[in-house]
Amino acid sequence: MAAKDVKFGNEARVKMLRGVNVLADAVKVTLGPKGRNVVLDKSFGAPSITKDGVSVAREIELEDKFENMGAQMVKEVASKANDAAGDGTTTATLLAQAIVNEGLKAVAAGMNPMDLKRGIDKAVISAVEELRIMSVPCADSKAITQVGTISANADEKVGSLIADAMDKVGKDGVITVEEGTGLQDELEVVKGMQFDRGYLSPYFINKPETGIVELENPYILMADKKISNVRELLPILEAVAKSGKPLLIISEDLEGEALATLVVNSMRGIVKVAAVKAPGFGDRRKAMLQDISILTSGSVISEELAMELEKSTLEDLGQAKRVVINKDTTTIIGGIGEKYNIQSRISQIRQQIQEATSDYDKEKLNERLAKLSGGVAVLKVGAATEVEMKEKKARVEDALHATRAAVEEGVVPGGGVALVRVAAKISNIVGQNEDQNVGIRVALRAMEAPLRQIVSNSGEEPSVVTNNVKDGKGNYGYNAATDEYGDMISFGILDPTKVTRSALQYASSVAGLMITTECMVTDLPKDEKSDLGNSSAPSAGGMGGMGGMM
């Protein structure tokens, strides 16, 4: 076991604080409409430029191990805020820095660290409750556009694109961000249910000019099994041929004789048919087949339910207005499923999302939810260079997370005003002793930090502006972009309540732990001289051997 370096008390806290300040100072220059960029060097390729707090935080690793521990703990604040709300990482880092700095001053002055932490926690609990009271719903496209614009660094085009995407696919719809091929940002909307499985044979293609299969008003056969024997399919093929409608087969796999027969029937025009593999794997495949069956009002032919393919009838088949298949994807448009059944399935998936523990499971459940809800929107980001593309894509993703958070929990006045107003409202709370009261005051002072930093980054005097804002009421605040005072809601400067709440909660949690730290332990650095001495010994022996041979 490696020898350890141990530091206690003030010596440990000073080192830790230095690390906190290095990371936070690098992150906070990005805050606000006039925040600056940070250039990040990469071990390969061109440097990247970002205005995203968590991206800056993730790159910072300090040489001094004790300082690095402080930096890593604040990095955790940014990461947690990012995971919870997808935005607000710079605000969270700034709040943590403010609480740690003020808190450690109080500890140095002789206050009890545990009581300080209790006071901070008490203030934060009250502040979160006040934020919820202050919050207003974010229901209309205008508010969504404003939230997206602010989070995308005052890029109105991005804000309106996100609002447009939410209008088209719904609040629960899947909206993804991709790198575009041109200079302009674009929105592409895929209506209906789309999954990542293409046609099993190119011979099914009936639109050769575009290389796709298009089926109008088709029947849809869903089977949770491999199909290789054509005899299993003959009864249903004959019934579909008599109806004159096309047929889409979705199964675990379809191969050999069965696939060959379908191709021949399709090419001869006996029955217009296409086949694709079912999406997903294992239990997820079963669930997605069930989703498709509810959307199209059909049944999944499953041997687990003692159902046989040979005995299936037209009543077991789903139906849709249109199906489009290319080599990679299948899109089912206008399924005839009953709205009540679809809504019940959506509610069931929402419940599963709440109970899911892994991010991967939540992501896959959200995809299923969106496909049932109405569609998928793709935001294609345009830029002139790859460096600009990466920076812009990160901003658009932040804006998308912020708008989702706003829809979920509502919005509060932006620009740091919400926390200033909350601090004023809870200024009369008291702790059980004087040390707790100091902790409460530490938290209240820290809540002014985001406003002060926004003002500082815009080149104005933080104390003057902060006092002017504190003298006002309600939504009155400072618009750093235009250097004027007024109603922040009217200015369109809004923050999602969830983002502000998460930033405050995570910052106070980690900062409280740092304030109560009394000892820090890390590995001692290896003695480079001894390493050099050890490595030179074999080399010298080898040389001696060579001399003897000569």
Curated annotation (Swiss-Prot):
<comment type="function">
    <text>Together with its co-chaperonin GroES, plays an essential role in assisting protein folding. The GroEL-GroES system forms a nano-cage that allows encapsulation of the non-native substrate proteins and provides a physical environment optimized to promote and accelerate protein folding.</text>
</comment>
<keyword id="KW-0067">ATP-binding</keyword>
<dbReference type="InterPro" id="IPR018370">
    <property type="entry name" value="Chaperonin_Cpn60_CS"/>
</dbReference>
<dbReference type="InterPro" id="IPR001844">
    <property type="entry name" value="Cpn60/GroEL"/>
</dbReference>
<comment type="similarity">
    <text>Belongs to the chaperonin (HSP60) family.</text>
</comment>
<dbReference type="GO" id="GO:0016853">
    <property type="term" value="F:isomerase activity"/>
</dbReference>
<feature type="binding site">
    <location>
        <begin position="87"/>
        <end position="91"/>
    </location>
    <ligand>
        <name>ATP</name>
    </ligand>
</feature>
<dbReference type="GO" id="GO:0005737">
    <property type="term" value="C:cytoplasm"/>
</dbReference>
<dbReference type="InterPro" id="IPR027413">
    <property type="entry name" value="GROEL-like_equatorial_sf"/>
</dbReference>
<dbReference type="InterPro" id="IPR002423">
    <property type="entry name" value="Cpn60/GroEL/TCP-1"/>
</dbReference>
<dbReference type="Pfam" id="PF00118">
    <property type="entry name" value="Cpn60_TCP1"/>
</dbReference>
<dbReference type="InterPro" id="IPR027409">
    <property type="entry name" value="GroEL-like_apical_dom_sf"/>
</dbReference>
<dbReference type="GO" id="GO:0140662">
    <property type="term" value="F:ATP-dependent protein folding chaperone"/>
</dbReference>
<dbReference type="InterPro" id="IPR027410">
    <property type="entry name" value="TCP-1-like_intermed_sf"/>
</dbReference>
<feature type="binding site">
    <location>
        <position position="51"/>
    </location>
    <ligand>
        <name>ATP</name>
    </ligand>
</feature>
<feature type="binding site">
    <location>
        <begin position="479"/>
        <end position="481"/>
    </location>
    <ligand>
        <name>ATP</name>
    </ligand>
</feature>
<dbReference type="GO" id="GO:0005524">
    <property type="term" value="F:ATP binding"/>
</dbReference>
<feature type="binding site">
    <location>
        <position position="415"/>
    </location>
    <ligand>
        <name>ATP</name>
    </ligand>
</feature>
<comment type="subunit">
    <text>Forms a cylinder of 14 subunits composed of two heptameric rings stacked back-to-back. Interacts with the co-chaperonin GroES.</text>
</comment>
<feature type="binding site">
    <location>
        <position position="495"/>
    </location>
    <ligand>
        <name>ATP</name>
    </ligand>
</feature>
<keyword id="KW-0963">Cytoplasm</keyword>
<keyword id="KW-0143">Chaperone</keyword>
<feature type="binding site">
    <location>
        <begin position="30"/>
        <end position="33"/>
    </location>
    <ligand>
        <name>ATP</name>
    </ligand>
</feature>
<protein>
    <recommendedName>
        <fullName>Chaperonin GroEL</fullName>
        <ecNumber>5.6.1.7</ecNumber>
    </recommendedName>
</protein>
<keyword id="KW-0413">Isomerase</keyword>
<dbReference type="GO" id="GO:0051082">
    <property type="term" value="F:unfolded protein binding"/>
</dbReference>
<dbReference type="GO" id="GO:0042026">
    <property type="term" value="P:protein refolding"/>
</dbReference>
<feature type="compositionally biased region" description="Gly residues">
    <location>
        <begin position="541"/>
        <end position="550"/>
    </location>
</feature>
<feature type="region of interest" description="Disordered">
    <location>
        <begin position="526"/>
        <end position="550"/>
    </location>
</feature>
<keyword id="KW-0547">Nucleotide-binding</keyword>
